[in-house]
Amino acid sequence: MARDLFSRYIWLIDTIRRYGSLTRDEINRLWMKSPYSNGEPLPRRTFYTYRNAIEELFKINIECNPSTFEYYIEQS
């Protein structure tokens, strides 16, 4: 279970880095094609939980641009 969760965090980080910035809908479409989704969408609450865990574990901030509603990884 923990290994699978860790893999999901890595998938989210890698996906946002690869594309630069993505809306929640775009993340969801890519998520549904991933091996972690079982064909199910990524619930909003789960996305925010993953986002917070990623910040806590990896010190990586996934920010949202309020004008475009796109998520991106804040460069430090």
Annotate each PLM feature:
Residues M1-S76:
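Short, basic/aromatic recognition patches that contact phosphate-bearing ligands
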